[in-house]
């Protein structure tokens, strides 16, 4: 555990000292973002901060054209494993003692760990086989042309880490996400690891520089982190 993220226990929720690498599956993404796979066929999708999730790999096998973007894609597969395995171990050993989670979809910390490991294993195989699907970079800059994607997804980044990411970073990131997106952006979850609504949500809605966008919280049936049963949908106003 010494090489993983440091856990900071003084608050109620899971507290991390940095963004961790945890893999999430195609099914989890569909639940987070209310995605219907048949409706995405043939569309272009960007997965921002995709990390070691298997969404990109699994989606492309279904005919959904997904590109994943993350800072870690400048690393070799071996270097990524050296980061993601200790991160998963750290979270696994702590999360069962944290009161801000519901154990419905994941039956236990062991089950959660199994799914996370499965996702990262699928990712690593695809990362080696199809490196063109994985683009390295760092928000708030995206190396894509305007309106390149029909849909952009952000999973467990931005609002969840508001203690480490400023409002200015969120503002600039949303502007950039919508620059490269001709359809809509979806950000999940809208709460912090304390299971509290992000303080940035009302600021974004009232920000004069973001008045060309329509913001809506869309309810989902999925809730692992307490109160994480919605995503933020961002659309261009007509």
Where are these regions (language model features)?
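Class I SAM-dependent methyltransferase Rossmann-like catalytic core
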Residues: 2-42, 54-62, 74-85
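Conserved S-adenosyl-L-methionine
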Residues: 46-49, 70
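Class I S-adenosyl-L-methionine-dependent methyltransferase module
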Residues: 61, 65-132
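A short acidic, Gly/Pro-enriched loop at the edge of an enzyme's catalytic core
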Residues: 137-153
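Residues lining the SAM
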Residues: 155-159
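A short glycine-rich, Lys/Arg-flanked "PGG" loop and its adjoining helix->strand segment in the class I
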Residues: 167-183
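Acidic carboxylate diad motif detector
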Residues: 189-191
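Class I S-adenosyl-L-methionine
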Residues: 193-238
């Amino acid at each position: 555990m010494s090489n993983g993220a440091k856990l900071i226990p003084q608050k109620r929720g899971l507290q991390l000292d940095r963004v961790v690498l945890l893999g999430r599956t195609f099914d989890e993404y569909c639940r987070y973002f209310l995605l219907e796979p048949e409706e995405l066929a043939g569309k272009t999708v960007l997965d921002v901060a995709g990390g070691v999730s298997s969404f990109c790999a699994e989606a492309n096998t279904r005919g959904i054209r997904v590109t994943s973007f993350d800072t870690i894609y400048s690393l070799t597969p071996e270097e990524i494993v050296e980061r993601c395995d200790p991160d998963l171990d750290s979270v696994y050993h702590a999360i069962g003692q944290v009161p801000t989670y519901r154990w419905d979809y994941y039956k236990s910390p062991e089950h959660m760990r199994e799914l996370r490991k499965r996702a990262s294993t699928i990712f690593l195989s695809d990362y080696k086989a199809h490196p063109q699907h994985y683009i390295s970079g760092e928000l708030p800059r995206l190396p894509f042309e305007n309106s390149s994607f029909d849909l952009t997804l952000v999973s467990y980044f931005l609002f969840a880490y508001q203690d480490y990411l400023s409002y200015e970073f969120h503002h600039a990131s949303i502007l950039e996400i919508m620059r490269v997106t001709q359809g809509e952006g979806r950000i999940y979850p809208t709460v912090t690891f304390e299971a509290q609504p992000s303080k940035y949500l009302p600021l974004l809605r009232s920000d004069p520089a973001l008045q060309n966008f329509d913001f809506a919280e869309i309810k989902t049936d999925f809730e692992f982190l307490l109160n994480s049963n919605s995503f933020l949908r961002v659309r261009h106003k007509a």
